[in-house]
Amino acid sequence: MKVRVRYFASLRQEKGQAPMEVGLDPGATVGELLSELGIEQDQIGILIVSGKSATFGQKLNENDLVTLIPHIGGG
């Protein structure tokens, strides 16, 4: 199955601006996607799947758009 991944903030600088297409086994979870991408779960502040708030255990579907927003700090 294929999903698209969109990055923001520091992840966008690291991974690129355009949404990336990733192939996964059917029934894969968001956590498995992050593992495939080499991203630690604790890096993610906001996680959205196809426009809705999501969890790391959520199963993905064909053509889902996964938006990854890292924790943002400042002072």
Question: How would you name each of these model-derived features?
Answer:
Residues 1-74:
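Ubiquitin-like/PB1-type beta-grasp interaction modules and other compact soluble beta-rich domains
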